[in-house]
């Protein structure tokens, strides 16, 4: 059986490794638009800051593919999928497939405003992007967008010695991950480390002759030589779309719980798909590494004839910003607008935690400066275990002896958060 995989990122590699794990004889062919082995996109800010050398970004070397008998076509983009004859087409020719996995990922979005084509505008999505930033030798930098990538980029550039301004259109830092109190603590961490943070501010244009010289917002003009755009991504679905594969209402490739697309023998996983939110059962775009890897495993197992269903995606953000652990799992309060929920929170100027509960289930967690219990909270959210059930087992020594994990969960919940 020949398996063809489009994409050499986290999802593509997880799919290839899963196929090889269960089938030593399978023929695996991957197409990579980049010329690099798999690397950690999460570590790109650490390369910018100088915390790690460039070589430490890479999770594999070229020989690793050979050792696992994975044939990879470097620097080749698939331009067409012939679903009738079951073949993919590149500028160098065509390749037949028995099963096809699309893991085409996503690309950074830059808004269509004046000045974004000037030298000095960058995104942070690939090794090549960061190579170009470092080669540019930035000094005065504006980072536009304060999501997790924007915050990490701002920190990395400040550590590198740049004067950094971080701009957010909405009213607080990391608004999709943190409610107001956690965000306020993060704001303080950033500003205490010489990052200028501007919220409720809209970028209107970038000015300069050939090179970035100034960024203009609705409130001010900011002198700068570099603009880093971290305002979101767009799914790479054009190839799938023109091949007759259905696209979901949120813009990702539509798949079922087995990662099957609308075309027979074609699967998709990772950033390019529209998956299901574990907590709501509704379509969601979840552009996070753990979800991409699990989706890829599910796609590969179903390709191999091993029926497996994807449980659903959970939003998980774990960042260390200036040595302070910042974590967001599941829903924020804003996401639950219109539903019944309860919030339990505590904190001071150094740490903060917030648990969001709805219908007896923990559906959200936010913490700043706290590391204990995060694995327990994640497990409770992913398994949708009712708090009442944890307490029932935890209080019964005979039951808890049979399910020791409930002891850990109960100790954490009912000792740390007595009001639950």
Where are these regions (language model features)?
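Mid-to-C-terminal Rossmann-like scaffold of FAD/NAD(P)H-dependent oxidoreductases
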Residues: 1-2, 272-375
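C-terminal auxiliary extensions adjacent to catalytic cores
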Residues: 346-410
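Residue-level detector of alpha-helix initiation sites
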Residues: 9-13, 35, 106-108, 128, ...
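Rossmann-like dinucleotide-binding cores of NAD(P)H-dependent redox enzymes
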Residues: 58, 140-142, 149-205, 288-292, ...
């Amino acid at each position: 059986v020949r398996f063809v995989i489009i994409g050499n990122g986290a999802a593509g590699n997880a799919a290839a490794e899963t196929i090889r794990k269960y089938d030593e004889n399978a023929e695996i062919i991957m197409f990579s638009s980049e010329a690099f082995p798999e690397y950690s996109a999460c570590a790109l800010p650490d390369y910018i800051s100088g915390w790690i050398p460039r070589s430490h970004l890479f999770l594999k070397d070229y020989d690793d593919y050979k050792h696992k008998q994975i044939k990879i076509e470097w620097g080749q983009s698939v331009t067409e999928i012939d679903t009738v004859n079951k073949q993919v087409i590149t500028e160098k020719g065509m390749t037949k497939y028995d099963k096809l996995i699309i893991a085409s990922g996503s690309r950074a979005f830059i808004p269509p405003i004046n000045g974004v084509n000037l030298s000095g505008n960058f995104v942070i999505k690939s090794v090549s992007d960061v190579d170009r930033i470092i080669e540019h030798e930035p000094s005065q930098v504006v980072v536009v967008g304060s999501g997790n990538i924007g915050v990490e980029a701002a920190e990395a550039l400040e550590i590198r010695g740049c004067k950094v301004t971080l701009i957010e259109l909405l009213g607080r830092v990391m608004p999709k991950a943190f409610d107001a109190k956690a965000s306020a603590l993060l704001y303080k961490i950033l500003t205490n480390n010489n990052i200028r943070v501007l919220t409720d501010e809209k970028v209107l244009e970038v000015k300069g002759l050939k090179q970035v010289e100034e960024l203009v917002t609705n409130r001010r003009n900011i002198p700068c030589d570099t603009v880093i755009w971290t305002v979101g991504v767009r799914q790479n679905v054009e190839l799938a779309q023109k091949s007759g594969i259905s696209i979901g209402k949120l813009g990702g490739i539509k798949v079922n719980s087995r990662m099957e697309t609308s075309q027979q023998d074609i699967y998709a996983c990772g950033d390019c798909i529209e998956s299901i939110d574990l907590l709501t059962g509704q379509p969601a775009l979840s552009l996070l590494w753990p979800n991409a890897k699990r989706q890829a495993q599910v796609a590969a197992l179903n390709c191999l004839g091993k029926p497996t269903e994807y449980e659903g995606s959970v939003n998980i953000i774990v960042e260390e910003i200036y040595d302070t652990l910042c974590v967001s799992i599941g829903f924020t309060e804003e996401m639950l607008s219109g539903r019944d929920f309860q919030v339990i929170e505590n904190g001071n100027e150094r740490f903060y935690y917030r648990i969001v509960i709805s219908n007896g289930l923990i559906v959200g967690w936010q913490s700043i400066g706290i590391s204990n219990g995060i694995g327990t909270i994640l497990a409770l959210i992913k398994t949708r275990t009712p708090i009442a059930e944890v307490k029932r087992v935890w209080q019964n020594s005979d039951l808890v002896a049979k399910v020791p994990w409930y002891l850990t969960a109960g100790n954490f919940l009912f000792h740390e958060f007595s009001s639950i």
